[in-house]
Regions:
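Active-site HxH/HxHxD metal-binding segment of metal-dependent hydrolases
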Residues: 45, 52-150
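Conserved beta-strand hairpin/beta-sheet module of binuclear metal-dependent hydrolase folds
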Residues: 2-57
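Short, basic and Ser/Thr-rich N-terminal targeting/leader segments
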Residues: 22-23, 139, 155
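Core dinuclear metal-dependent hydrolase active-site scaffold
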Residues: 11, 28, 147-156
């Protein structure tokens, strides 16, 4: 559901099916330059909710700002990057998101869990059922990094 929360600022509720969080809010700032903040999981339902909002708002070009690296906020970024959106994030967030997009991060995490006492039969290689892993971004993205003190000019 798309709601105007302030002049030229809209909130789209994005479903997170079968997840205790149930949903996240994605924001759109409209003006001469448009910005979408966060994307939801890498799931069809999230993508459809965002496509619906973009269509309803009548925008064709927009950038995407990622608030943080959790996959419920950045899962779809490679799809938006491929469609021509500029993807903005802090450098640490962007580097970690790209690191998580491959298998090395998840193998290292599995190994740490085992090292610190989680029985492999109960957890270990089963981290693939965790939604943070299951619905994460799957491809590296060329980020535009933002830093503390940077001013982003969107809306109008």
């Amino acid at each position: 559901m798309l709601t105007e929360v302030a002049k030229n600022i809209y909130k789209q509720v994005v479903p997170l099916p079968n997840n205790p969080l149930r949903e996240i809010n994605v924001y759109f700032i409209l003006g001469e330059k448009n910005l979408m903040i966060d994307t939801g999981f890498n799931r069809r339902e999230c993508e459809e909710a965002l496509k619906s909002a973009v269509s309803e708002l009548g925008i064709e070009e927009y950038d995407v700002f990622i608030s943080h690296l959790h996959s419920d906020h950045c899962g779809l970024i490679s799809k938006f990057a491929k469609s021509g959106c500029k993807i903005l994030a802090g450098e640490t967030e962007g580097e970690m998101i790209n690191f998580e997009s491959g298998n090395l991060y998840w193998r290292m995490l599995d190994d740490l869990f085992i090292k610190f006492g989680f029985p492999e039969a109960q957890f270990g290689r089963n981290t693939d059922i965790h939604p943070g892993r299951k619905y994460c971004n799957t491809e590296k993205v060329n980020f535009t990094y933002v830093d503390e003190g940077d001013v982003l000019e969107y809306g109008g």
